[in-house]
Amino acid sequence: MRQLELLAPAKNLECGIAAIDHGADAVYIGAQKFGARVAAGNSVDDIRQLCTYAHQFAAKVYVTVNTIIYDDELEATRQLLDELSAAGVDAILVQDMAVLKMLRNGDCPHVSSVADYRGTVPQLHASTQTDNRTVEKVKWLAGLGFKRVVLARELSVEEIAEIHAQVPDVELEVFVHGALCVSYSGQCYASQHCFGRSANRGACAQVCRMKFDLVDADGRELEHQRYLLSLKDLNQSAHLEELAEAGATSFKIEGRLKDVSYVKNVVAAYSQRLDSIIAKHPDKYCRASKGHCTYTFTPNLKKTFNRGFTTYFLHGRQPDIFSPDTPKAMGEFVGTVKEMRRDSFNVAGTAAFANGDGLCFINQEHDLEGFRVNRAEGNRLFPQQMPRNLRPGMVLYRNNDMEFERLLARQSSVRKIPITMMLAPTPDGYSLAAEGVTATIQCEHQQAEKPQRDNIIRQLSKLGGTPYECSGVEMPSDFNYFIPSSLLADLRRQWVELYGDGSRCENQNHGDRLFDMNLNQIQSKTCPRDSAVPHYDYPYLYNISNHAAAAFYGVKEPTAFELNTPSFWRGKGEAPLWRGQGEAPLLMQCRHCLQYAMGYCVKHGGQKPTYKYPLFLRLGDGRRFRLEFDCKHCQMNVYAE
C-alpha cells in the first residue's frame, strides 16, 4: 500500500500548526537563513515546537535550506544543520551541493551524534531549485543519496510517469497548487540581473509579475504594457488521482508567504480530495499521517487568493496559462454590473454579498481596479467610493469574502486520532491497551453490584485536550468489575502519556539510516548534460557559489551568476569580467511561450508570423530582453540585452 502525502507550506509556527490541524501530512518551513523565501524565516525553537506538534499525528516537518551559499556562510550553515537535526526535523530540502557534503560527510557534529544514538539523519530532499525536469537528472540525484526529488512544475503527467518508471525507488514530490514561476526553478537570473536580488538566494523581485511591451526587430509594438510573463496559479485538485497513478508520492501546496486563512482553506480542500481517492482505493493508497479532521466550514479554493487557475502543462501545452491583465488576485466570479446609480449599482448573478466584501474588475484600459462594499442590500451594492471606471456589463470578481474570512478566523478544524481501547483484568489490577501501547494499574478486583460498562466507557473516553478520540472500548464478555472513576482516569492519563512518548520516539526515525548510505557517493559528480535541457554550456547554470560545491562538481572555481554581478562585489573590490560565453546572459528558460500564446506557433497549428525576429520584452524604463524561441525543445528563452 502506497502512502500519499499532502505537503503544506508554513510561513511560521501558527501556519504550520494550522496546516496539521486541517489535514496536512507534512509541512515545509524555512529557518532563519538559507531558505528560498527571505521573508519567511523562523527560529529553530519554533521549528522544534512544530516538530513536537506534528509528530503527535505522525506528520513530518521538512526545513528548506535550499538557497545557494557563499564561502563565508558555510560555517553558519553547518551550525544551522546541527540545530535542525537536534530539533527533530524529518528532512532537509537542498539546492547547494555543499549542504549535501556537510550532511553526509560527517561535517556536522550533532548530525553525527544523532546518527550514533538513533541510527538516522534527516532525509535529503532535492529542492525544485535543482532543476529536476528529466529522468537523467533524477537518476543522478538518486545516486547521490537523495530520498526524494521535487519535480519541476512544468512536467506533464506522462513525463512524471516516465521518471517514476525509470527511477522507482525515489519519492516524487509534485506541486499541485499555488503560484507558478515562469522560468524553470533554479534557472532564473532576471531578478539578480535587474535588481541585484537573487532568486537562488530567496530574494526574488518577481520580474515576471511586471509589465512589458512586446516589440519586434523593427521596433513595432505588438503588445503594450501587459503582464506577459505573469502566470495564473496552479490548481491540480481535480487531477490528484491521475498524479498518484503516475507515481507522485507527495502533493505540494506552494505558499510559504501566505497567511493562515489561505493555509486552512487550501489544505482542507486538498485533504478532502485525497481522502476521497483513498476511499475509492482503500487497498491501494493510505494517508501518510494519522488522524481525521472535522471542519466548521466548507473548503472552497475559489475563495482564497488566486490569479485564476491553470493545470499548466499537466496534459501538454495549453493556451490559457497566463494572466496578461494583472498579476494580482482576482478571486471568484460573482456576476456582471447591471444598472448603475450615483452611489450604487446592481449585480446580475446569484452570489450573496456582505458588508466589507472586496470586489474588483478589469477596466477598459486592461487594468485591475478594486473597491470595498460599504453596504449590501441584496444584489444592490453601495461601495465606500463609487469606482470611476466601472461600467454596465463589466465582469465582477470577489477577492475578499468577509463571511468566509470570519469563519476561518475562528477555530475551523479539529484533528483527532481515533483509537479503540481494550480494558482487561490482570492478576494484580487492570490493563488498558490501544495502538500497541499498554498502561497498567495495580489495585484489588471488586465485583460490581450493578453494570459498570457505560461508566467505564464514559470515563475512558474523556480524551479532551489530547489528539485522540475514543471510537470504542472493548472488554471481555465476563468483565463485571467496579473500578473507581479516579483509577480509570489515572489509567487513561497513563496511556495517553505512554502513547505520546511512543509517537515521539517513532517519529525520531523518519530520517535515513546512516549505515544504508554509501558515503563514498559524495564525491566529484558530473551533472548530466541531457539533450532535453539545452544551454548547460553556460557555467553559471549549475549555481556553484562556493568552493565546497566547486570541489563536488570537480571545477576549480565557483561560477554562480550571483558572483559575477556588481551587487555581490560591492565593498569587496572590483567585480571580475563576465565569465559567460562572450554574449548576453541567459536569464530565463520558460515553457510558457509568447509566440504560442499569440497564435503564431506553426508547430502547434498557428499562423505564420508577420513580425521580424528577434522579439524583445521591454520594461517601462526601457530595458530590453531578447526572446529566443527554441522550437526543438518547445521552450522560450529570455536573454539580457
Feature locations, PLM:
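Aromatic- and glycine-enriched glycan-recognition loops and surfaces
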Residues: 39-48
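Well-ordered mid-protein domain cores that form the structural environment of catalytic cofactors
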Residues: 78-107, 119-139
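Surface-exposed amphipathic alpha-helical tracts and adjacent flexible/coil segments at the periphery
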Residues: 1-22, 26-36, 50-51, 57-85, ...
